[in-house]
Structures are given as C-alpha cells and as structure tokens.
Amino acid sequence: MAPSAIPEPPPTQSSTLPSHADEYAVQAGVPNFQGYDHITWWVGNAKQAASYYNTLFGFRTVAYQGLETGSRYFTSYVVANGGIRFVFTSPIRSHAHLPADEPISDKDSALLKEMHAHLERHGDAVKDVAFEVDDVDAVYNRAIEQRASVAVQPPRTIQGDKAHGDVRTAVIQTYGDTTHTLISRRGYSGPFLPGFVAKSSPPSSLALPPINLVSIDHCVGNQSWDEMVAACDFYEQCLSFHRFWSVDDKTICTEFSALNSIVMSSANAVVKMPINEPAPGKKKSQIEEFVIFNSGPGVQHVALLTDDIVATVTAMRARGVDFISVPATYYEAMRRRLGSEKRRWELARDFETLERLSILIDYDEGGYLLQLFTKPLMDRPTVFVEIIERHDFEGFGAGNFKSLFEAIEREQAERGNL
C-alpha cells in the first residue's frame, strides 16, 4: 500500500495576491527535490483504472499489492511509462459492513473509512503527489516546524528484503484532501515499494501504436475562491518553494470567465506545482466547475512530457483518447503571428500536422512549447491529462489560456455547467 494519510485542512491564510516575485524568493540551503516519484489515485476499481491507462495512454503494469500479497483491505496497481508512475488504489472491503469481530488494525480501519469517504466526495481522483527528496527527515521537519497541522505520517523506514533494500517516507498535507508523500529510495531496487510484487500487463492480441513518455512535467491544483495564495504560502513556508511564474485574471480571461494562477517551484526547479483559483466573470469558470464536482480543491490535471508530441498524440488518438477541439481560427491567427514576430527558433513540427491534431503552440523569442489537453477522464468533469513538448521554453502555455478556456467553455456549455 502506498503511503497515504488522514488529512487535516491547512490553516486559513491571507488571500491577498503577492505583489512582487521576491515575496516567494528562492531559499538557499534547503534539501533537494529530485522530482516527482509517483502519483497515487484513489479509485473505485484499481484493476480497471490500470487497464484504462495501459490501453489508452500506453502505460504498462509494473507492480501490484493486494490479497495475494497479504493486503486484506486495499488493492494497488502501479503502471509506468518512461519516468512516470501512477498508482491506482481501491478499497476491497466495505468499512460500514465489516463484522464486529473483523481482525482489522486501527490503522487499516481508519484508512478504509477515509478511502470510502474520499471516493464518495471526490469520485476517482488524485489523492497523493509523491516527491523524491534527498533527505525525507529534513523536508518533513521543516514543514511541521512551519505548520504542525500538516503532519500526517512522520518519517519511517519501510523495510524490504535484503535483495532490494528499503525506503524512507513521510507524508504531509497540502490543499483539500491532497497529500504529498516524501520519499528517499536510497538505492532501493524492488519493483516499486516494499510490500509490492512485480506484475506485468496481461498479454493482448491488439496491435496498439507505442507511446513513449518522458516524465511528469507539472501537476496543477485548483482552489476555490480566494484560496490560491494560502495554498502557495504552504509551498513557500513548508517546502521552501518559490514563485516561478504567475498570471492574473487580466491575462487569463474570456468573455465569460477568468482565473488567477501562480506556479510554485522547488529551489532547483525540478518540481513545479501551478495553483489556480477562479476570478470573477459573467459565467461559471472551468475552475469553479472543477471545485463543484470535486467537492473542494484538488489536482486538476497532470502534464506528461514527451519528446515527440505528434507521434504521442497520433498514437493516443488511435488508442481512443478524447482530446479537446481547437477551432481553425486559432491556427489562422497563430500562422500570422509566427510569420510576423521575431524569434530565434524555427518550429520543428509541421504546422499543418499540428493543426490537424489540434496541438496548441506557445512561445517567446527564445523557444516554444507544444501542448494538448484531454477531455475529463471521468464522468465528473474534474481531472484531465496534458501532453506537452518543450523546446527551450519553461512557460506554461499562457498564450494559449484564452483559446483553452474557450474550448473548455464549449464543453461546459454542452454539460450545462457554464
């Protein structure tokens, strides 16, 4: 079972927007973040969720924990593609219907109850975003020194067998019901974590096109009204992150809706966590829709980095992934911009192919990115996936936010949620 937690809400902070970048300055002498280790989803059926990501997104099953490994109340499947690991965990017993003499530990009982409550409130959703760090104890201790309320699981060593070694973990609370596991693998060589066994995807006769992903690029959290700064304060105070990038409702708006966004980054810039909140508009924004159907703040989307977005999106479309639609007017305007603005790079992908695949382009003078977003992956209009390719450009698609918002607003209107 991947480390998880019973959450406590973070204390209320000021909702005043920071006025300068140095309000979240880079801090020296802090433990290093190595990157995203894995993302844990709590879902109703872990086996089906793993199969879904394997089939549509080209992941493969690499590890398992369940009844056969001695886990009597939870099942987890770990799927991977490149440096990306998703863990899908489900309860396999009803907490409300356990017999009085059920030999369940207090810890498992509390976790089983929490997991069912999480599923009822959020549906299938991201529960934990795990960071690999070089010193679990130092990161955890700083976090709880700043805010004792974020403590979920103190540092502990998960013992493996002699052949594979052990890992050190801790868990802290972030926005909503979301947690961060801090993990140091210390040379651990097992398939995922101690307690998991290696498992492969069942053989298939389908000839599906391969998908090669690289890593998690960023992970976006949506907040309710006036909660963005409080969430960013947590990352600055507890994890020594700094403000990497920000935009406000004057930049990210359409005729109907708007948002504010701040990207928080680890000191070494290997982990970036954009934080969004709604801003006033004529109608309901995508951020408001998310918060309503997620029943509170949570992870809105996970961006997956690829070296070849054309091949990746082509393969995903062939496998059945449903992406947002981008109107032809976007590409007409983009073609004019690319033809008239000065820049030090040339587009490495065929423009007509990008248009055919509805891939978005954002850039500055020194580089560019290509990106595309799936439609929500669940019946609730909550979590989705972004596919992104970068070329000397560390932005987050601000130039596409208006087009993206308009595309999502069309989907919202179809759902009756605009």
Residue spans for each PLM region:
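Core segments of cupin and vicinal oxygen chelate
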Residues: 2, 31-86, 145-146, 155-163, ...
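Terminal substrate-recognition subdomain of acyl/acetyltransferases
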Residues: 2-8, 13-15, 181, 363-374, ...
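Hydrophobic, small-residue-rich alpha-helical packing segments that form membrane-like cores
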Residues: 2-39, 43-45, 50-51, 55, ...
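N-terminal beta-strand motif that seeds the catalytic metal site of vicinal oxygen chelate
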Residues: 3-47, 126-131, 189-232, 295-305, ...
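Vicinal oxygen chelate
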Residues: 34-44, 77, 99-142, 171-172, ...
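Extended catalytic-interface subdomain
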Residues: 89-91, 106, 114, 121-255, ...
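Active-site-adjacent "gating/activation" loops or surface patches in catalytic cores
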Residues: 199, 268-287
